[in-house]
Amino acid sequence: MNLSYIVASSFKNIMKFCVLMTYIFVSCNKNSVTRNPFLPELDFEFSINLNLPLYDNLKFTGGSLLINDFGHKGIILYNLNYNNYLAWEASCPNHNPNSCSKTKLLGVLTECVCENYQYSLATGQLLNPSPKDTNQYPLINYGVRISGNNLIIYN
């Protein structure tokens, strides 16, 4: 093995390393995700049995149901499609919880009673933002996993 081959090989490895490090440093971003200041984090886990008649609406795509016992103002469960379920906080995310901040279900939407903000249950996004408000938050999403006939909802 000659010396020029070793030098060329080492130079290629150094160049690869420099390119990789440049990519890593350029990829870093100081902008962080803005956490919703109105609704603090909650710690919970519960399950529901989809075989019970109470949860029949969740057996169909687009079906939704409000469960009042968890979350700030309850949790909305939504059947996105056959095996994909979503769980959303039922409290309007754009102000402190109060007497009118619980959202109401409107088919595949939920609406904040205070400002009539409407949110998609498929994405959690605000559908009718107000031009005067600068910080508008989506619904808070909770985790859902399927275990047999049970949905386990957690945060």
Residue ranges and their predicted role:
Residues 1-28:
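Sec-dependent bacterial lipoprotein signal peptides
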Residues 1-2, 93, 127:
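Short regulatory "switch" loops immediately downstream of catalytic or recognition motifs
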Residues 15, 25, 89, 97, ...:
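Mature extracytoplasmic/luminal segments of secretory-pathway proteins
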Residues 29-32, 112:
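A sequence/structural signal for flexible, mid-protein segments enriched
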Residues 31-107, 120-121, 140-155:
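N-terminal pre-ligand scaffold of iron-sulfur
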Residues 101-139:
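Surface-exposed, polar helix/loop patches in the mature regions of secreted/periplasmic/lumenal proteins
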